[in-house]
């Protein structure tokens, strides 16, 4: 606040987007900002509000985990996925990385096609062979985040033309489209048009993932279209606060948010 030339009593609203502890956070923030109305939502809500600039739609999140979440014009909400790696996370970076490891196992066993993923998997896991991978995993030296990190190498090999890597991303795209389609059908049962915004690190894979995702989405939810998010989740929290204050979302407001978005991007 000091760096912005503000004091706590000048803040009239604060929006929060949290994974957990939503209700517990409110009194903490209110103690710091006594004049503010504090609005706390789940992080998927502020992610969607930012991505769609406050409009209805669906976000499709694919990072270490995966989930689809949507809000329609009536304010109704629905989600699909988000069950963690044991029960779900299909189409996530973890799922892609795990599939890459399994593909390498099959290739070396002679049960699957050869793939350029083999040296990539061993390099990423810092293991010379499958026996070492096995030992490292069961001794707790390979974390889920490490497996998810393999998705970057899968994307690179898919871009280079490796069939196995391309198929892994195509299967991930089908799973992600299935989640988004399920949400779209529940919130827009009459087949109205809906925008789906892809969010999360896996989408840095680019066209090898986005192309099959568009095709799969067209098959499962023909009225859905894929668009890039307009604002990041942190600005979704700002929009959450503005909406609670009934501030009109004018072009000037969006220009200010756009400038903030660019400043945030420059910090990364």
Where does each model-flagged region fall?
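Phosphate-binding/catalytic loop of phosphoryl-transfer enzymes
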Residues: 13-119, 265-267
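ATP-binding/phosphotransfer module of carbohydrate and carboxylate kinases, centering on a glycine-rich
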Residues: 1-10, 28, 50-56, 102-268
